[in-house]
Amino acid sequence: MSTNLIDSFGRKHTYLRLSITDSCNFRCLYCMPDEPFSSSSSSKLMSSDEIFGISKIFTEQFGISKIRITGGEPLVRHDFAEIIEKLATLQVSLGVTTNGVLLDKYFSLLQQNQIQLLNISIDSLDSERFKQITKRDLLPQVWDNIMQSISLGFKVKLNAVIMKGVNDDELLSLAMLSHNYPIEMRFIEFMPFYGNSWEKGKVMPINEMLQVIEREYSCIKLHDDKHDTSRKYKLSEDSKGCFGFITTMSNAFCGGCNRIRLTSDGKMKNCLFGAEEFDLLSLYRAGEDIGNLIKEGVWRKHKEKGGQFTEMNTVDNSKIINRSMIKIGG
């Protein structure tokens, strides 16, 4: 029988965000630090066996029922197929977060292992702007793979980080994707991480984003479950999909948080913004039990945003102790 992972505020944790690499074939400005960046050496990363072994402890001992595989860009890892095949043997819902460029190489693998959940980043529908944000001229490949994902029957969520003065003028065109296709289009508020030049003035909160969309459409509010990170709407009754807002900065969902994060170098983070890290990999490699450290790490979770800030108005990014987004895992 598994033990529930409960923090000191009574929140039960059933969802593991599992980063398998901090390498990426994009250089997105909201994710990568401004300074020169080097990926971790392979010796510092969890091996495929270690990823499976630690994940198995989370699922079998602690009742984790959902694992989202992230990066970096998880599909650039040379043994991605091996990792997928091992994790697929666990009694857990599996999904993958990706920038989409390499998806066409792995559709068969994902289908063979019953993985249907895909989160794909697309921050712009304009080729030049896409290149400005990602530093890569690869929008056609991403778009083609999104369309193929939909046609193959994957459950697709599209993610766009909205930044004022960068891509906020594309809200309507991105929202229209949820009308035309059976997807969930998610608009993410720009969040502060090490080296990403976050400024309050670049954040477009939910009320402003929704106001822009509602000038053109009478949006329909949908039901949100307790653990949902996205506040969901439809443009109209005949929309094929829906859209939503991930409101980490303006209206946090910490009260219903059920997530734990494991970085590619085997550190558990109990919060995306948390400064504390719990080194599971070193213990695991030493043959030690990691269960007590997992329980302790979850119990010590702060009430809100890693204890580093509460309101967006009080954020000083220079004083936040954290990794860059790519080092945490998307």
Language model features by range: what are they?
Residues 36-41, 126-133, 193-199, 279-280:
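A short acidic, helix-capping loop that chelates divalent metal ions and anchors anionic groups
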Residues 32, 107, 134, 272, ...:
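Short, flexible helix/strand-to-coil boundary loops that buttress conserved ligand/catalytic motifs
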Residues 8-49, 62, 272:
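Canonical Radical SAM [4Fe-4S] cluster-binding loop centered on the CxxxCxxC motif
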Residues 2-16, 180, 190-193, 197-330:
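Auxiliary Fe-S-binding modules of radical SAM enzymes
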Residues 45, 51-69, 73-188:
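Radical SAM/AdoMet-radical enzyme domain recognition
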Residues 20, 185, 266:
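Residue-level signature of catalytic and energy-coupling elements of molecular machines
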Residues 26, 127-128, 252, 278:
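Glycine-centered loop/turn positions within well-structured domains
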Residues 12, 17, 30, 66-68, ...:
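Residue-level recognition of specific faces of alpha-helices
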